[in-house]
Structures are given as structure tokens and as C-alpha cells.
Amino acid sequence: MPTPLILHDDRLLPADPATRAIARRLYAQTAALPIISPHGHTDPAWFATDAPFANATELLLVPDHYVFRMLYSQGIDLDQLGIPHADGSRAPVDPREAWRVFASQFALLRGTPSALWLNHVFHQVFDLRIRLDAGSADHYYDHITAALQTPAFRPRALFERFNIEVIATTESPLDTLEHHATIRDSGWSGRVLTAYRPDAVVDPEHEQFASALQQFGALTGEDVMQWPGYLRAHRQRRAFFAAAGATSTDHGHPSAATADLSPAEAQRLFDTVVRGQATPAQAELFRAQVLTEMAAMSVDDGLVMQLHPGCFRNHNRALFERYGRDKGADIPMRTDYVHALKPLLDRFGNDPRFRLIVFTLDETSYSRELAPLAGHYPALLLGPAWWFHDAPEGMWRFREQTLASAGFYNTVGFNDDTRAFLSIPARHDVARRVDSAFLAKLVAEHRLDEDEAMEVAIDLAYRLPKQAYKL
């Protein structure tokens, strides 16, 4: 007999009845607010073409490395799940069979945020009322895949149903942004922006750096083998992105290191980099210098700068060689911010024209470094609990460890940072519930009045991300 799938109305709210009652009232004021999704990795082609999603596997399993990394950890080969290889090929696996494998292992996700999000998607988006397991796999696959062929489940219809006010995707400087142009020219009212992510032409250790740099020069007409031309190329592409609606840039570096070299020093370093002779230390220094140059450009063009450092990318070499990037083998690292950011903050930390949103995968830095920095420098804001820490527990720890030094208003609310489009409402719902629970505790302890908590809850869910990202 199938087991019912139930979403409890009080999920993630406090167990204490009095505090829970406060949290319910706070959550009621934020639950239906529009979604501001200022940073993420959805595919703009979805909204440009508005083509139906293919099937349950292609939509909910293949793009979601949160999910398939857990299955891989338990010995499930990624070929069994239909995950594409680095060269674009795939093992000849039937999507239904891949879904059956996933369904048979769904219990591995118990207690994880992925289970929270997926059960929300199953229940709220697809009206499924039994749990996913081996016995219900085909029912789920058929029900979801059939729904995806209907007009109500086209990307634009879902965007509107989810009450998304604005969503930002993330593109390389080499992207033509043709999908964003198609969206703008279509007459559709949905607001889909881009963000400038230049990692492939900034990181000498990126496997595509040499070829990307050549394309960068060809695209811009600049001599990107010389430092001044390289910087002009960035300015040109940033202006192109801004004209297409971008309000932010994003930088995914191994560390938070910044530097402030003289033009002559930067040119000498750049010469070494473009010859392919940079040592790891020189590659790190180059990334550090480019971050400071990006900050200088943000002062001029007004784009908000995001920094997502501290991840050892592609830790599993064999997996990377077979499947490429973003396949669940990225591991958090210890990250320094106090010393690393100082060269950049010395130049721009007090400049009212500059805004830097910093994220971390190193929770030990919250109260020791990041909250004190954000609680001092006018230009610096804290991004929300990110990636390995966007579980309810991680969101709670973020608030506990940053509130004393940074308050609420040196943070930027929530962003979902996901490729999994259908999980966006679930992720924002979890954040709103956790913040309601956290604020309810402060009210119950008489640290906030309820009207103050109500205002903060709305600010965190809606106003702060709009303000921080200039939306």
C-alpha cells in the first residue's frame, strides 16, 4: 500500500507552541510575497523558447547535482542516471530506467534539504499524494512527464505560477545573450536578467582558459594578450551585459584573495599567464588582481559584485575527466577573508558607488571574519547561507553567527542559486519558514517586538534582495 506524501503546515516552525504561534503569524505575511531570484543558474533558453520540458528525469534529476552526488556516494554510476559526459555524449539509458534507479534510492535523501525541496515540488507543483519509492516510480514518471506536455507546465507558465518577479541567470563573457534578447523581444512580461561570470577568462588554471582568451579577443576586437587590451575587453563585455539588463557580476574563485599591483607589475604577471607559464602562486595572484580590477569597473558601471570563493572544484579527477564540471565533486575549504579582501577594501571598501556581496562555504568565518567586516565596511554585504549550508540548519547557523556583528541589514535576504527551476519556490519557502522561526524566537525572548519581526521578515524575503542587487 502506498504511503501518503504529506507536507505539514508547520514544517520547520518551532516545536514550542507559543513560539510556533508567533512564527505562524510571521510566515503568513511572507508566504505569498513575490520571489526575487537575484542569483542562479537556470537556462535562459527555457524562457526564450518556452518549449516543454522533456520528461521527469531530464527536468528533476539530470541537472541536480545535489541529488545525484548522494546517489553516487552510495555506488550508483552516473551513467545509470543519464548524466551527460564531458564531450556531450551519454550512456544509452532509458530516462524511465534512470528515474526508477533514482526512485529506488530516494530514501538516501531523508533529512536533507533536497528531500524537502523535492517533496514540495511533488506535492505542490505536481499534486502527487504518495511518496516516491521503487513502487511508485512509474506512477511518478508518467504523471510528471504527462504534465510537462501541457501548457500549464511550460517554462513561462511555471515562472508566472511561481510568482517570480525577477530571476537572474549566469553567463560567460563569451555568451551572445541571444536567449535574453529573444525574451526581451517576445513581449512576454517575465523579467529574466543575466549576470557577468568571467571565470573562464580570469582563471589561468581553468581548463578552457587559453581557448576562452582567444575567443574573448575575437569577440571584442581587443588585443587581449596585452594587459590594457584585456581590461578593455572586460569593460566592453560588461557594458554589453548591462545593456542586456544585468545588474551584477559573479566570481567563483578558489580563495577570496585580492591584490593591488601597479600597472607594470600587472603587465609582467599577465605576460607570464598568457604564455602558459604561471605557477600556482602566480595564477592565484592573477585571479586576485583581476578581482580588484573588477571592483574598479563596478565603481564605474554600477554592477553589483558577487564573490563565491572557497571551493575545491572537481575534487574527483576521474569523474571530472569523464563527466566534466558541476557533477557533485566540489568540496568546501577553509577560507580567509580578513587578509584576503584587504587590498580590495583598502581601495573601494568605503566607496558609496561600490557594492560587494560575499559568500562562504567556511562557516567558521561567519562570526570571526565576515560579520565583523560587513558590520563595518559600507561596501560589503553578506550573501546568505550557500550551497552546502542552505539546509535549514545552515540557515539558522548563519543567522545566529552573523546577527550580533552584522545585524539583518548587512545581509541580502535569500537567493536560491540553483539550476533546478522547479525547486525555486520550495527553496524560498524553506528560507521564509526558517527566518520566521528564527525571528519568532527573538520575539518570544523579548529581544524584538512582533511588529519589528514582521518588518524584518518581509525585508529578508523581498526588500533586501531587491535593494542589494539593484532590482
UniProtKB/Swiss-Prot annotation:
<dbReference type="GO" id="GO:0008880">
    <property type="term" value="F:glucuronate isomerase activity"/>
</dbReference>
<dbReference type="InterPro" id="IPR003766">
    <property type="entry name" value="Uronate_isomerase"/>
</dbReference>
<dbReference type="GO" id="GO:0019698">
    <property type="term" value="P:D-galacturonate catabolic process"/>
</dbReference>
<dbReference type="Pfam" id="PF02614">
    <property type="entry name" value="UxaC"/>
</dbReference>
<keyword id="KW-0413">Isomerase</keyword>
<comment type="similarity">
    <text>Belongs to the metallo-dependent hydrolases superfamily. Uronate isomerase family.</text>
</comment>
<comment type="pathway">
    <text>Carbohydrate metabolism; pentose and glucuronate interconversion.</text>
</comment>
<dbReference type="GO" id="GO:0042840">
    <property type="term" value="P:D-glucuronate catabolic process"/>
</dbReference>
<protein>
    <recommendedName>
        <fullName>Uronate isomerase</fullName>
        <ecNumber>5.3.1.12</ecNumber>
    </recommendedName>
</protein>
<dbReference type="InterPro" id="IPR032466">
    <property type="entry name" value="Metal_Hydrolase"/>
</dbReference>
